Amino acid sequence: MDYLDLVDAHIDRRADITIAVQPVSLEDASGMGILRLDRDGQIAAFEEKPTREQLGGMPTRGQTPGLAAMPPDKPFMASMGIYVFSRDVLLDCIAQDGATDFGKQIIPHALSRYRVHAHLFRGYWADVGTVRAFYDANVMLTSAAAPFTFYDPRRPMYTHPRFLPGARFNDCAVRDSIINEGSHIDRARIEHSIVGIRTTIRSGASISRSVLLGADYYEADDNAPARGNNPGLGVGSNVVLDRVIMDKNARIGDGARLTNEPGVDHADGDGYYIRDGIIVVPKDGVIQPGTIV
């Protein structure tokens, strides 16, 4: 999003508050902040994570001029959690006793006191507030047909400099993946995956449809006494990962197999958990050698 468009819309409408919004489906609406617009495009009602019953009075499609082109399968308007406030209005809103949550407190209370408008954003946006949504949004980036790319020369994306060396590959097979700097990958197979900074992947590993968030530091291979019985930082030899989120500084021991072949939807295990069928190894988590999930 070009935030200048949002700010310009806020000024042009003489709004006190402007909320960036996108149309969503019935299935997605119950997990988001849903708003209803009046015929002038001003927000008339707002419900944070509404029930199915509350959604009955919230569809916007067909009721507001200029929004007739909304997809028929996405009749609800959802807040993107991106706001523009006029300065004095913001100070007044946050001065309310106990008002700390924009979706549940500040925005609903402001509707009767201020001009609160919506700004429809038609570009790519994804809510990554659940494990499945976070996973899908990341793996999607590895597709050649992805609706969003970090490599658009008109809108380049930057991260803060870390001054790491380039990723190093030794006799690897990598397809449709994003590999970040400072990674060291030895004789591994990687497809449709994201590999974060400073990731170590050892010989014989096979990684598919997974998101590895990398590490905050390097660890020497001869550092075994310091780590005790834990495997080395990163992914061990002959590990198989499929549909896995591996958080920062996690360790997966040699020969472990994390594939969720039974298709478990929700579970908690030793060093991991499963949500929406996705295996998650949390930050600093440890999977012992030979573990099968």
Label each residue range with its predicted role.
Residues 64-73, 88-293:
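Left-handed beta-helix
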Residues 2-84, 97:
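Conserved core of the sugar-phosphate nucleotidyltransferase
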